[in-house]
Amino acid sequence: MRAIVEEHDKIGHACKLSFVPSPRERATIPRMNTTTSKDAASESDPARSFQLSKPDLLTLAAIAIVATLITNLLHEGLGHGGMCIATGGQPLVISTVHFACSAEPRLVAAGGTLANLVFGAICWAVSRALKRAARWRYFFWLLMTFNLFEAGGYFLFSGIGNIGDWTAVVAGWQPVWAWRVGLAALGVITYFILFVPLCLRELRPFLGDAAKTRVRRAWQLTLVPYLTSGILSTAAGALNPVSPILILISAAAASFGGHSGLAWMASLLHGPRIPSTELQMPEIERSWGWIIAALVLAILFIAGLGPGVKLHSV
């Protein structure tokens, strides 16, 4: 109900009416304004909006597929293949799990890991330069993570298991145990002490600033590419022309093993060791362009490169 206040104008004796809100209505109005201001603040603040939304998982998987393909080609093609040509060898066959060269010097074996390290650093710089393009920054973050994890993983894998690229690099060097211990130690330092913390810190712009939200979003942004990359790499590796053993020691080891940091590093966000950052990216929304491109490239990767491509006859 509203009370009517009647005021008499001294000159015209006119009657002026005004409406005064009741006490209940006066109490209601500020609440409405407060709610509206909170809604506006949450819409304009990416960190707040992260608490109510989640990245599109299908797009995350698509980006992971493209990043997996590129990382593989960098390692096998540009790394091993480029070093083969640079050392005077003749490229023979390339697949998703091996590269055959007419000569097998140590540098050819080391070329894959060296390419991973170089391009991991390049992708780190590119991702930091992207301030608003969420999908592209996440793509380069994944490229950085895949490349650095594979590099550190190869050191560790060769040192502990005596299998892989760096086993060929140090073959014949004495004492054998010292080189294996050195490779294992290098793998532990690069993978667990350098690369995992670095990659997790670079993921912070996608996480928001609320503690529970950060951990939940980190699991989504790391587990999806981990599983996607592992499944794709293993499926393509199953068609390799050399030996079924390469499915285990190359395809599965490099993906499920080498990328395994993605499966657990989100747990490091508990506690104050890795604080949030002021820069927060927009949400990663669905992109049919990424999804369609990923499907086409995945088919070509499995059916084309999986069985191997002959580059030169022996």
Question: What label would you give each PLM region?
Answer:
Residues I29-V314:
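Hydrophobic transmembrane alpha-helices and their immediate loop junctions
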Residues E7-I11:
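Alpha-helix boundary/capping motif
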